[in-house]
Amino acid sequence: MAEEISTQAPRILAIRGGAIGDFVLTLPALAALHRAFPGCHMEILGYKHIAELGLHGGPVAGSTYARAVRCIEYGALAAFFARAFDLDAELCRYFSSFDRVVSWLFDPDKVFETNLGRAGVKNFTPAYTPIDNGSHASLQLAAELAKISVPLDDPVAHLVLAESALESARAWLAERDGDVGTRPLIAIHPGSGSSRKNWPVGNWRSLGDRAAAAGARLLIIGGEADTASLDYLEKKLEPHTPLLARNLPLHLVAALLTRCVAYFGNDTGISHIAAAVGAKCTLLFGPSGPSVWAP
């Protein structure tokens, strides 16, 4: 029988590790919690540079997924993953301040769950599930919420950005692009978390050449793992004066993608962000299965 909880606006803590794509694929589950508990105070414990996306947008206009974000990479938190250790008093107060904790962390022996109980957490929902090749990942990531009577009405990830994030993109473009708005902006993200999933960088160069020849302005996006590809494309596409978005905060990347008429990328977290903000995407899937992992 599904567990029943109060429909009053509670304090909810969502705990989500994983990479960028994993986080975005969990947004439908977070949106379902917001729909089930309108006005709830949600916070996210996760990798801060990723989870902060939830501070800058939400499932609908004027909303955010999170009111606050806390970094999961915190030394005192390690005791919560071990047996019979003293627990940090401040973290105990933090966890026990929530009416419900929902965790997507792998916890096969329930050590973390047990320690949250020791910390004073009364309502805990273990939402982790290993993703198989059955249904779409967003459906699998939300499946455990049915046990607390939270249905997944919409499996699509939506990230409607706050005006402050959109303004940051306008300012970034204005500083770098004298003809901003006069040419269509096309985004290219040549990397991913695995070289096996990457389209050859020479093909990205050819795509950039063709897009520029058709009158588009190029926006090339990447992080530290994409340095070699970005350096190559910056050099080879230099005649087209591409805009380079290197190592930018994710909310700024998301906002820049809302300004693009098209986005091209591999199976990667940035591609999930592009789809979530409503960009028109062409995504290349190699060894991974799009029926499970595509936006």
Role assignments for model-derived ranges:
Residues 1-295:
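Catalytic machinery of carbohydrate-active enzymes
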